[in-house]
Amino acid sequence: MGRMVKIFILLKDKPGALKEVVDELASLSANIVEVVHDRLSSNVRAGTTGVTLSLETEDQKHMDKLIQHLKDKDIDFKVLT
């Protein structure tokens, strides 16, 4: 088992938005362990949806690469754990 990381991503509430993020994660071989989709929390603005992803990565280096890739793609996210 690799290193686990949980991230919260704020997406535009439109068809295909989650797929775009999942495709980016897949391109770096991140294993998605859990997905929680939330439109109702107070921290989710109108027209957006919050998604919490639990990911398995190979090691710390792989996790750092994944986080940098999301930043480079201007994906609105924060690391929770």
Question: Could you tell me what each predicted segment is?
Answer:
Residues 1-81:
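A conserved regulatory-domain signal marking ACT and ACT-like small-molecule sensing domains
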